[in-house]
Curated annotation (Swiss-Prot):
InterPro entries: Glycosyl_transferase_4, PNAcMuramoyl-5peptid_Trfase, PNAcMuramoyl-5peptid_Trfase_CS. It is found in: Cell inner membrane. It is an enzyme of class 2 (transferase). Belongs to the glycosyltransferase 4 family. MraY subfamily. Its main location: membrane. The chain crosses the membrane at residues 28-48, 74-94, 99-119, 133-153, 168-188, 203-223, 236-256, 263-283, 288-308, 338-358. This is Phospho-N-acetylmuramoyl-pentapeptide-transferase. Catalyzes the initial step of the lipid cycle reactions in the biosynthesis of the cell wall peptidoglycan: transfers peptidoglycan precursor phospho-MurNAc-pentapeptide from UDP-MurNAc-pentapeptide onto the lipid carrier undecaprenyl phosphate, yielding undecaprenyl-pyrophosphoryl-MurNAc-pentapeptide, known as lipid I. It holds the Pfam family Glycos_transf_4. One of its GO terms (cellular component) is plasma membrane. Keywords: Cell cycle, Cell division, Cell inner membrane, Cell membrane, Cell shape, Cell wall biogenesis/degradation, Magnesium, Membrane, Metal-binding, Peptidoglycan synthesis, Transferase, Transmembrane, Transmembrane helix.
Amino acid sequence: MLYNLLLPHIHNSHIANLFHYITFRSGLAIIITLSLSFVTGPILIKFLRSLQKYGQPIRSDGPESHQTKAGTPTMGGIMIILSSCISTLLLADLTNKYIWITLFGFISFGIIGFMDDYAKVKRNNHYGVRGKSKFLLQGIISVIIYVLLEYLDKNSSHVLNVPFFKNLSLDLSYFYMVFAIFVIVGSSNAVNLTDGLDGLATVPIAFTAGSFALISYLVGNLIYANYLQLTYIPNTGELTVLCSGLVGSCIGFLWFNAQPAEVFMGDTGSLSLGGVLGIISVITKHEIVLAIIGGLFVIETTSVILQVYYFKATKGKRIFKMAPLHHHFEKHGWAESKVVIRFWIISVIFSLIGLSSLKLR
């Protein structure tokens, strides 16, 4: 909004001219989301406590140390969604189609997560919305997003770019729709599965969002895209502002979510954040790079799939002490803080590997 209001005055004012630069607006987005999180955090947490008598239900079969978390309010993802959306509406170019499509997906996945959190709190158990119902809703939203992208961009590509290999790509043709939906829904649920310890998912999400802030900027810049031999996609640079807002809001949320957490992001936060990252990866044509940068989310999800499959195949045996993987290490005797910090380190490594694919070909 500020960008659109100041646009006519760019050549007449030094301050207005600053808003012409995506990098300036992205930096400002981080500052605004951080500030909003610090200011609204205590108010929101107090409000959630007043509404939630028992807080987020704690699984009885989980690590014993988790029983001390009883009473901690959930739905803290509202803080992340609000601060990110406000900064984006203030600083991004509101005539940009990708901004509106991404915000639509972000909020829609957040609503699904809110419904799930609300069901858990109301029933006082960890069973929220049925899994099939959640997948169906996520699928419908993903289809709408894909159709919007196809309709608004007549030259949209169905090519899947393979990182680290020069000029290697796969034309998925009509199958690309299925692939894009899989990426968005899969990303949403992968982040959701990772969000099981205080601060565990928050930092990797920030790293991933920061990485895609850079990717969006490069892909949307003709000079940089040509130099790095990336697929140039006009107008995606504005997503840098949105991604930067996600980084700031996640860091701000971590202030309240660090161990011992004062609030959990809940499915409201994890489903929306995972979904928006999936959407951005589809828009920028860096779907495989998302799987690399978000490697921690992939590992956590894979551990659950393997555990369930092996349990059914062997009629009761388990590969891990508990899934997702972070609970396995807790059951193995690792302190929660050690699991979280080591997983953060792994996330940094994956982010560096993913970003290196932009140059190494």
